[in-house]
Structure formats: C-alpha cells, structure tokens
C-alpha cells in the first residue's frame, strides 16, 4: 500500500489526489509527536473524521462527505446533479427543506423523464404507466416545463413510486425517502400539522388567507400530483401538496403505497392515503 511521509506537525494532514499533502487546522486532532511518521491514506481519513466529530457541536452532529461536519438546519446537502438543499431539524428528524429535483440515481443512471403530458398513460412515447400495466420508473415536471422552469424551481419534480424505491437510490447518499412510520412521526410531532408544516407562500390558493404558518421550516408547497393515467390533477391550483413514502400498502403491496397530503384549507390534519404506485408525487429526503 502506498505510504505518505508526513513531517513533524501538531495537527493532521490530508492527502490530495495528486499525492501532495495539504496541512489542515483540526483542533482536537491527536498530536503526532514523533519526528517522522508514515501513514497510509485510510489512516489519515479515519483520524480526520475522528477530529471532525469531536469538534462538532451541532445537534445532530455527524461527519459529512470527506470527513467534514454536518449540522442539520445549518448545513446543506447536494444531490448527484449538484442541486443543493437546505435542511431543517424537526424533533429528532433532519429533513430536506425543499422538494427533490434530481434526474439521476446515485450511481449516475438517468431516471426516465416523461414529458408527454398525455391523459392516457398508454399513449405513444409515454413512460408513465397506467395502473396495473407496468412498473416503469419515471419523473415528470409540472406542465411539462423544462427542468429550469418556474414550476421546477418552485415545486421540484414529481416521481412515481418505482423511481422513489429503486435500489439505486434517489436521495443523496446518507439520506432516504421516509417510511410511512417516519412521515407519521413528522405529522404527530405537534398539533395542527396541516398549518404548521405548510409554507406561508402565496403559491397556496389565495382563497384561504394565511393558509400556512410554517412553524418548523418544513415549508410544504402545493406541487400537486400526476395521476397514474398520466394526466396532471390538482396541479397549479394551489390546493394540495403530496409526498411519497417508501412504504407499500400491505393490503395490496404491488400496486398501492402510502402518501401524505396537505390541503390548502385543512390546518388541523394531514391526509394519509393508499395511492397507485404509478402516481407522481413530490419527494422529501430524510437523513439516515
């Protein structure tokens, strides 16, 4: 194994890809007392992470990619496309603060885009699946806008359940699509979750003034849904936000799964529905 020779230092060093050594200030790192020490790269990584964790004061606090610290509510997380998401701590759960808008799984494989906008999921060229006929993973964008359009910016993308639960993983590394139980824990965290998890944004239907108070920073927006038929329903009306979980409905697990819905005028509760897996919903990611 290739060794890296480190001169006498009081703090750790980190090797670059070019074999160079860059000195880093890491308070709390174990002091190297001998004049010349030989470390392999894996040893350096282990010590780097140990020092970062010991000096991280946030709650929760873990080592992030490359050994850096992560503090939920302050730190951000990026998906494989480079989109950056703010984070929010609600109880003991760390959530992304906006909806997912990634086009690839974590291994770089593209998620099929369905931009047909048709009303029949079996139409020519469509990858969106009519119920019971297919299990093709896909995502779409409201009104079939481009990925940098206003709707994509505001609401993220809509994914069917096959994309959400693909083993290649849709959330950033170290994050996952919440289970039914995990989303239920979010809903039960406080009273009147329909109001407190809803954004104060005017994107919600203005017929219900002050529809959200966003007490915790979850900032749910009315991204609507794409029906299993391929048509967009309750979309851009400002009425609903739909979120997938990774949990199938055990009474008919091959066709339906659990989603949560926030309605414009329901400030007390958040709906939980068994929904066709071909439907397109928003996705929030939860830290492992």
Label each residue range with its predicted role.
Residues 10-18:
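Hydrophobic h-region of N-terminal signal peptides that target proteins for export
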Residues 56-288:
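Conserved positions within compact, well-structured domain cores
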Residues 1-4, 17, 33, 39, ...:
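Generic cytosolic/nucleocytoplasmic N-terminal low-complexity/intrinsically disordered segments
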Residues 4-5, 20-70, 77, 284-288:
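Enriched but not universal
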Residues 3-11:
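Small-residue packing motifs within transmembrane alpha-helices
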